[in-house]
Each structure stands twice: as C-alpha cells, then as structure tokens.
C-alpha cells in the first residue's frame, strides 16, 4: 500500500524518506495541525518544546485513531518549531524519531518558524496518512 522511496542520488536521510507513494484507490487522511493542547484546550509544556512535541505526537496519534489509522501509516509530515536554533529543532526531531512516526520512515520537513497559532505554542505537526483498508469506518 505504501512505498517509501529514498533516492540513491541524494544525501541519505537519517530517519525519513525522500518520498512516499500510495496506489490509487487508497484512502488518504489529511490531518489538521496537531497542537500541544490537552483535552480541555490548555497548553501543555509551556516554554518546553520537547514536552510540547511529546504532546503533539500523542494528539496526532488520537487524530489518526479517529480515522482508523496510526503513526506507521503516516506518509508525510511538516514539523513546525518556534525557534531559529538548530539545537532546539534537533531536540524536537528526536521526539519525532522516538515515536512511531520513524517506523515508515515517512517523508518529512522540519521548519523553524516565527510563531504559531496559540499563545505559548512552540510545536505543531501536520500529517497526511494512509488509512488501511481493513480499518473500521471513519468517525465523524
């Protein structure tokens, strides 16, 4: 269902692929940005990008569960971090690597940005995932 591609002509990515290919007819879920808020809408990990990344990945897992998918079926992500410091970006990426997102490995882009949508928010991940055929119907 998912074919992960790494081009031998390019620098080998450490924990992601250059592209993900899915066959026509596969159900695809386009997920809204996962943010570091708890179920009551309160910010988790204020001032701590690593803690926020952990919450974002946990919330992403819930989003995927709601569409009958999981981290292993993620095709592509964009990881946004409010920082221009590569050490901070690397620390957030380590959380991504430690999660099931690195199982694929999926294609990904890591970006340092000026700000995100919620006050105090430092991390956000958007994702596209395949939805396995054998999964239950998607909840609405």
Question: Where do the PLM segments sit?
Answer:
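Short, polar/acidic, helix-capping and beta-turn segments at strand->helix junctions
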Residues: 1-140
């Amino acid at each position: 269902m998912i074919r992960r591609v790494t081009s031998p002509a390019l620098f080998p990515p450490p924990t992601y692929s250059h592209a993900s290919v899915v066959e026509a007819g596969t159900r695809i879920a386009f997920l809204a940005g996962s943010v570091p808020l708890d179920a009551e809408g309160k910010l988790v990990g204020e001032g701590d990008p690593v803690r926020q990344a952990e919450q974002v990945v946990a919330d992403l897992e819930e989003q995927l569960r709601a569409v009958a998918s999981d981290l292993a079926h993620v095709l592509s992500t964009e990881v946004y971090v409010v920082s221009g410091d590569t050490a901070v970006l690397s620390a957030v990426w380590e959380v991504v690597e430690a999660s099931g997102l690195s199982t694929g490995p999926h294609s990904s882009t890591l970006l340092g940005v000026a700000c995100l949508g919620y006050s105090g928010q430092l991390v956000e991940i958007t994702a596209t995932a395949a939805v396995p055929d054998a999964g239950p119907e998607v909840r609405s």
